[in-house]
A protein has these predicted regions:
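Catalytic core of the metallo-beta-lactamase
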Residues: 17-24, 30-39, 136-156
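Generic recognition of flexible, low-complexity loop/linker segments
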Residues: 8-10, 23-24, 33, 93
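Conserved phosphate-coordination/catalytic loops
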Residues: 61-64, 87, 151-154
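Pre-active-site segment of Zn-dependent metallo-hydrolases
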Residues: 27-32, 39-82, 94-103, 107-111, ...
Length: 156
């Protein structure tokens, strides 16, 4: 029987000035959104969501992104940027923060409020939070970000 997720080959070193995009979930599925950007030996995580199981997953409550590819590099993470407060974008953040509890979190006021509630549910302490709004520009290590509004089914 073949494994549903075959082992991927090792990724070579990142060329100087190169940007690596590592999707850890949410690619080809609706849910479990998590993308890591690697640049100059630093990492930026965008979203950290869960996937809700289907009927052929009895007894499974949540499906998390695979933290394995970055687990030994969590000290290189500049921040976790949350695009909005839906569970498929923030639901796995408490599990990531159990691995490294001081990762700065960036998001809108509403998104960070929803995350705070989730952290209390998991009995985790608050981490450094940076509230951003549409039009804001910030730098996180070597990463420059600009926040733009999009139409979606959440008011933020």
């Amino acid at each position: 029987m073949s494994h549903p997720h075959p082992e991927l080959p090792e990724v070579g070193p990142l060329p100087e000035g190169g940007l690596r995009v590592i999707p850890l979930g949410g690619l080809g599925e609706i849910g479990r959104n998590m993308t890591v950007f690697e640049y100059a030996d630093r990492l930026l995580i965008v979203d950290c969501g869960v996937l809700f199981p289907e009927e052929h997953h009895p007894g499974v409550d949540l499906i998390l992104p695979d933290f394995g590819p970055i687990r030994d590099r969590l000290d290189a993470v500049e921040a976790l940027v949350l695009t909005h407060g839906h569970e498929d974008h923030i639901g796995a953040a408490p599990y990531l923060l159990r691995e490294r509890g001081d990762i700065p979190i960036v998001g809108s006021e509403l998104t960070l409020g929803l995350l705070s509630s989730k952290l209390r549910e998991h009995r985790l302490r608050e981490t450094v939070r940076h509230v951003v709004a549409e039009g804001d520009r910030i730098s996180l290590g070597p990463f420059d970000l600009e926040f733009v509004a999009v139409n979606h089914s959440i008011p933020d």
